[in-house]
Design a protein with these regions (language model features):
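Conserved core of the sugar-phosphate nucleotidyltransferase
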Residues: 122-217, 224-225, 245
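Short beta-strand segments
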Residues: 6-7, 60, 113-115, 144-148, ...
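Conserved N-terminal catalytic core of the sugar/cofactor nucleotidyltransferase
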Residues: 2-5, 15-20, 30-113, 119-125, ...
Length: 424
């Protein structure tokens, strides 16, 4: 069995902790029990590796998110880079064609696909490994995982199974209903939340790509990717497939892709430098800045702060965040890099000051364009010709390689200047 994990997305639902580069899958909000925080992606990979260290995992992410993936996972997983955002079916088709043409995976191999925008315990990931077995019945082309509802919710689509058995044929799908209709689905039809988890054979995905895009060749799809039809996997595949089964899951699972879900999941635990009085109620505060947030007497709020902005919202207004955030959507200031990370401290029309973090053992080349000068000041750590207090300047058009012996933090100041005509 192989797995494809979808990690694209624009990051608006968890703004300002996420952005279009550092999307929600990369937001490190979950305590690992050792005082460190990890992301949904890191949690998913950790759980999968605990069950089967050798299973092949392919991450499908946008090209702008490649550095984020490598920053958190290194080179331990395969990665397909989407040149642009074209919805889930193009992303899955590209990953499937990569498995065929690059990794030479057997067309009959079961493939499990899911989006990394939920948080679940070990039993959920163990269930993923059993989905491929259902395909062996000779009649099922596609298997879904349905979540046993904990309440009638209008946040999810619903799967209507043919029975209440652990594995059942799928009778119908229903888009997000109101809570009364959802209650009826659950009571009368044993309905399940649609978790966006699919399993099928590789050749099935390739056939669907051929039908929709006229090709299942990786070289062809990557070349044409920006022009491929924007279409979801649900619309391109699920709604058109008559032979679908669903496996029922009744363990811990939470949609962590919104502040509403995150607030429930974190139980309104504070993250970062936060001080609150005992009159605060039902309020989640997440602070990724290096100065404190003081909260007094606030109720039913989500407060989140990062270099990208500050959110203060009543919880019942959180569903509107994705549309409202466009008014303050700026170039990201927090960016993961394969060597560590970059945090923009100050930005103006002609200058930018950033904190760079470089992991021990990493090597990075700092470049400058014509008309740009950079000054680097080492704050912590050591490397070749570097120690705390070292200052060096990179003139325009030059480059400097940093080899980190230990973890290094440094301040990078970039200044643009006008070029005299004789210097062209």
């Amino acid at each position: 069995m192989k797995m494809i994990l979808l990690c694209g997305g624009g990051g608006k639902r968890l703004w300002p902790i996420s952005n279009n580069v550092h999307s929600k899958q990369f937001a490190q909000l979950f305590d690992d029990g050792n005082g460190n925080y990890r992301s949904m992606l890191e949690h998913a990979i950790s759980e999968i590796r605990e069950i089967d260290p050798n299973v092949q995992v392919t991450i499908a992410a946008g090209r702008v998110q490649t550095e984020e993936v490598r920053s958190q996972l290194g080179f331990d997983v395969s990665l397909t880079e989407e040149p642009s955002r074209r919805n889930t079916f193009p992303a899955i088709s590209l990953a499937a064609s990569y498995l065929k043409d690059h990794d030479h995976v057997d067309p009959q191999e079961p493939i499990v696909i899911f989006s990394v925008d939920s948080y679940a315990d070990r039993s959920f990931y163990e269930s993923l490994f059993s989905l491929g077995e259902i395909l062996d019945d000779g009649k099922t082309n596609l298997v879904l995982m349905g979540i046993e509802p904990t309440s009638p919710s209008d946040k999810y689509g619903y799967i209507i199974p043919a029975s209440s058995d652990e594995v059942s044929e799928v009778r119908a799908f229903r888009e997000k209903p109101d809570t009364e209709t959802a209650k009826k689905y659950i009571e009368e039809h044993h309905a399940l939340w649609n978790a966006g988890v699919f399993a099928c054979r590789l050749e099935y995905l390739l056939r669907r790509a051929d039908i929709v895009f006229g090709s299942s060749s990786y070289a062809n799809l990557i070349q044409r990717y920006p022009e491929l039809k924007k279409i979801s996997f649900d619309y391109a595949v699920v709604e058109k497939e008559p032979n679908i089964a669903v496996k029922r899951y009744n363990g811990t699972w939470t949609d962590a892709g919104t502040w509403t879900g995150m607030s429930d999941l974190l139980n309104d635990k504070d993250i970062g430098q936060v001080v609150r009085d005992d009159q605060c109620e039902n309020t989640l505060i997440v602070n990724h800045l290096d100065f404190p947030i003081l909260a007094m007497g606030v109720k039913n709020l989500v407060v989140a702060a990062s270099r990208d902005g500050i959110l203060v919202a009543e919880k019942d207004r959180i569903p509107d965040l994705k549309t409202v955030v466009d008014e303050v959507w700026l170039e990201p200031r927090v960016i993961g890099k394969r060597y560590g990370g970059k945090e923009v401290l100050h930005r103006s029309e002609s200058s930018e000051t950033s904190l760079l973090t470089i992991r021990a053992g990493s090597s990075v080349t700092i470049k400058t364009d014509i008309g740009v000068r950079k000054t680097l000041t080492v704050l912590h750590g050591a490397g070749e010709k570097m120690k705390p207090g070292t200052i060096f300047t990179i003139q325009d058009g030059e480059k400097w390689q940093i080899n980190a012996d230990t973890d290094i933090e440094l301040i990078e100041t970039m200044i643009e200047f006008e070029i005299e005509p004789e210097n062209y």
